[in-house]
Amino acid sequence: MLAQQHRMRAKAQFSKTTRSGARSGRRNLVLYTVKTPGETTSIGFIVSKSVGNAVTRNKTKRRLRELITPFVSKHPNGYSLVIRALPAAAHADYLQLSNDLDSALASVLKKLDAAPVAAQSPEATATSTTQGEEH
């Protein structure tokens, strides 16, 4: 069970994470992540009615909550994550969800680590393009 301090509840937090975060999709879920240095790691879940009825949605959330707990233990500060369950998650077993979440986490963390380099690349490209036009 996630501690209350790690639960994301505000709509603004969900919006910020899903709109400006790194994203990684898998068969059963989509993971959005933003680095939040100095803040407690917060986790939010989006499980829509397309996943199934209330019982199925809650079962899916419980599984995902249990699977993300080790990440929160390892990284108690510095991240904001939103996990959106896709309809296939309702029929996925625990191992499939675990593999998808681990894979998505690895991918997103890799993207976040590469983000500063990517942010510098367009500037360098724009500078070289501008210089090329002057000749």
In which residue ranges do the predicted regions lie?
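Positively charged, solvent-exposed patches that mediate nucleic-acid binding
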Residues: 1-135
